[in-house]
Amino acid sequence: MATYKGISFPDTVAPLARHMPAVDDHREALAALSATWDTLGLLAHLSNLKADMREVRASFGELTGELLACLAEETLALARGPLGHQAQIAVDVLTRNLFERTADIGFLATDAAIVGACLDRDPARLAALREHLRTFAARYTVYRDIVLLGPDGRVLTRLVDGFAGWSSSSVIGRALGGQGGWVETYEATDFCGDALALTHARRVEHEGRAAGVLALVFDLEREATLIFERLAREDEVLAFVDADDRVVLSNDAARLPPGRRITARPDAAALRLGGVTHVVARRAAQAYQGYTGPGWAALALAPAELAFGDGAGDAGPVAFTGENVFSQRLRDVPVRAREIQRRLDRMVWNGRLHQASESSAFSRSLLEEIAATGRRTKDRFERASSQLLATVAAGLQAEARLLAELSVDILARCLYERANDIRWWAADAALATLDAGTVRATLARLNGLYTVYANLLVFDTQGRVLAASRDAGVEGRTLANPWVAECLA
């Protein structure tokens, strides 16, 4: 715990409490009431008023600290909630995107045109292959280069003009030793001009022997920018950091340049950048079908003044319903406030009974002031409690809204990838043979790589299914769905 202006806050909250207007407003108002209670307690003692205010004052102090700490924690949670979702979605969208690339490399490394070009290295065939790769890249727009190399590291052909000699990149040796598996690297690569490149590579095989290496260079800058633009709001910073806590990319190179080391703990809620305190949330990638990506995490940051600027404001009252929505701690705050008020009412009532036989105008005035201060205290606690619950409700609403919007975006991106798949596969030479065995084997291999599909079918011009990747029971069946005619039109 750390103390800020006489109030104890949890260590994660204390550095940010000064930036929370709602917390500061209630703290000042409650501090003024506390001073009033101290004065009234002293006057009650000096006037011999039979009213012991020590218990009420102690309860008031305890609940003040509890209320302000709770309000600060929920205000921070309201700010960090969306940031945490932004960071989680950013790294998960990137991870899912890269998972699709592992399927691409598995498919392309066995492409007949690529295998053939590795074997004979005929210039005309390599030129034709380059156009083949350009067609692929035009459909799958996530690559900035595709490079085919011989086992000796020589660049045979590539998507864009560039390094054309013999590469000494470590990715080649790793891919050649991969025995049919892909490798993923993020390192400076000579065939990418010695710049950092996120590459998926796999060896190209012919009759069980290595004929070359295919490398897909992911357009990280473009794809990360698309993610950042979709998720980051004004003046927010989104960044990917590696396993060593160094920034890979961010949407604000001035505040978080590539290569900068993040020294804050992974669970830290605050981070200072350029002399400005930021609220921060960090999220690691969640595995997708066992794939966790290159081991990166995402950071989302917002200046504290911006993050806490809106708050719940004048939000309407929140009903105390739904135990699964509000924590017991939150629900206890107004209950404890009402209990303090009941004790205060009893104390004032007893004091009035005691003074009924006396004519002390001062004592009667003092009791009236105690009662009025009690009402102001009750009002302040109710307002703070209402704002506290409205803060939580606003956070839940914002969370639901953000997740709903991004769920639609993720689904749309997934379907976009599926449209790319079908356009590319429709031109595959193995499928064009219409040989049931060849087509079935090809579809099964594709479905093993692109696991999002429940089944893959090839049907002839009459709509009769020739082969299926998984459900052989549909083979020979004639499809009568309206989309069949649309595909054949």
Explain the meaning of each model-derived region.
Residues 78-86, 120-131, 177-183, 213-222, ...:
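Short, positively charged
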Residues 126-140, 213-267, 304-330, 436-452, ...:
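Solvent-exposed, extracytoplasmic
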Residues 204-206, 285-290:
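Sensor-regulatory modules in signal-transduction proteins
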Residues 213, 297-298:
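PAS (Per-ARNT-Sim) sensory domains
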Residues 258-261, 276-285, 299:
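Long, ordered, amphipathic alpha-helical scaffolds
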